[in-house]
A protein has these predicted regions:
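Extended, low-complexity, turn-rich repeat/linker tracts enriched in Gly/Pro/Ser/Thr and Asp/Glu
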Residues: 9, 100-108
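Beta-sandwich interaction modules
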Residues: 1-9, 79, 86-90, 128-166
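Hydrophobic, ordered structural segments
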Residues: 1-32, 151-178
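Intrinsic, low-complexity N-terminal interaction/targeting segments
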Residues: 55-74, 121-147
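Short loop/turn segments immediately following beta-strands, especially the blade-tip
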Residues: 21, 116-121
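Disordered, acidic Ser/Thr/Pro-rich linker "stalks" and the adjacent N-terminal cap
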Residues: 17-87, 103-105, 175-205
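Short beta-strand elements bearing conserved aromatic residues within extracellular beta-rich modules
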Residues: 110-112
């Protein structure tokens, strides 16, 4: 992407909207399946009063509460949640839940669930598999949990009880063989011919 201005002058912001096409050479092995830079995205949420849950999958660590997901206090029943599409189908291995900067407004508990939308309906609550049961978390803390998951996941649901903010959420795992093959093809097809010539050894076979 190249921006040209004539003859000069300033630009406050430039937004280019689309879907991330990650370089598959960085997706081989254990990666953050949820990261926006790898193609993860927010697809549903209950509340984004102060800040969107899309923030918690952005690169790097948050520098303040405004760079995480900050929801409003709930006055009724229920709990807040966010649903994400993973970069591709993969097997989750461990998760990091970061409540840094959230001191008086961190969740009391969190829960994680996953689903493989290739063979199940994400609108069917009974089709989701629990990755992390409802677990107490501390304010202003980075929590890490090892997951025991047999199958692949494509979507992740985060539930916070009853509400509360997070700085970041990382879901580390391995893409399945077909997902990695599809990622290679998508990336290759998105390259201009002049770029393909520079990485000819990466052409899908």
């Amino acid at each position: 992407m190249r921006l040209s201005i004539y003859p000069d002058g300033g630009v406050a912001r430039l937004r280019v909207h689309g879907e991330v096409v990650p370089d598959p050479r960085f997706l081989d092995g254990t990666v953050d399946l949820l990261a926006a830079e790898n193609g993860g995205r927010l697809v549903g949420w209950s509340d984004a009063f102060y800040a969107s849950p899309a923030n918690i999958i952005l690169p790097g660590r948050a520098r303040n509460m405004g760079e995480g997901w900050e929801n409003a206090r709930r006055r009724g029943g229920g709990n807040d949640f966010a649903v994400f599409a993973l970069a591709a189908a993969g097997r989750p291995r461990h998760v990091e839940i970061d409540t840094s900067y959230y001191v008086g407004n961190a969740p009391g508990w969190v829960r994680l669930s996953a689903i493989d939308a290739r063979s199940a309906d994400i609108d069917d609550d009974s089709a989701w598999t629990e990755l992390l049961p409802r677990t107490a978390v501390q304010p202003d803390t980075r929590h890490r949990f090892v997951l025991d998951v047999a199958g692949a996941a494509i979507h992740l649901r985060l539930d916070v009880y009853p509400d509360g903010g997070l700085s970041r959420l990382r879901l580390f795992g391995d893409l399945d063989e077909q997902a990695l093959s599809d990622a290679r093809r998508t990336w290759w097809d998105a390259l201009p011919p002049s770029h393909q010539a520079l990485v000819a050894d990466q052409a899908p076979r």
